[in-house]
Amino acid sequence: MPQFEWVHAAWLAMAIVLEIVANVFLKFSDGFRRKFYGILSLAAVLAAFSALSQAVKGIDLSVAYALWGGFGIAATLAAGWVLFGQRLNNKGWVGVVLLLIGMIMIKLA
């Protein structure tokens, strides 16, 4: 396992934030009909992967990727709710709960 340092956690947090930003810009792009937002989305995805590549220097890839994806999904869900009024049905909430349980289990492993 790589040597953990807080800087790697900061890179992971940055990757998560950039993924959320990319997803919001993607929604604003309206299927890339609004090219400016589409380009911003692509730039944010590239920056997110760059930050993730720095994070995995000190965090196992399996843990970093699972946390990046899980927190990204949960936070994008929250952003969709706040910014766009999107809601989940009961099956969707079950999925979110299972996702969170899985992230906790990975962190505790």
Curated annotation (Swiss-Prot):
Location in or out of the cell: Cell inner membrane
Keyword annotations from UniProtKB, A to Z: Cell inner membrane, Cell membrane, Membrane, Transmembrane, Transmembrane helix, Transport
Recorded GO MF terms: amino-acid betaine transmembrane transporter activity; antiporter activity; choline transmembrane transporter activity; spermidine transmembrane transporter activity
GO CC terms of this entry: plasma membrane
Disulfide bond annotation, renumbered to this chain: none
Pfam families (alphabetical): Multi_Drug_Res
Any Gene Ontology biological process: glycine betaine transport
InterPro entries attached to this UniProt entry: Small_drug/metabolite_transptr, Small_multidrug_res, Spermidine_export_MdtI
Transmembrane intervals: 6-26, 36-56, 64-84, 88-108
Membrane topology annotation: Multi-pass membrane protein
Recorded family membership: Belongs to the drug/metabolite transporter (DMT) superfamily. Small multidrug resistance (SMR) (TC 2.A.7.1) family. MdtI subfamily.
Protein's job: Catalyzes the excretion of spermidine.
Quaternary structure and partners: Forms a complex with MdtJ.
Name of this protein: Spermidine export protein MdtI
Organism: Citrobacter koseri (strain ATCC BAA-895 / CDC 4225-83 / SGSC4696)
Originating gene: mdtI
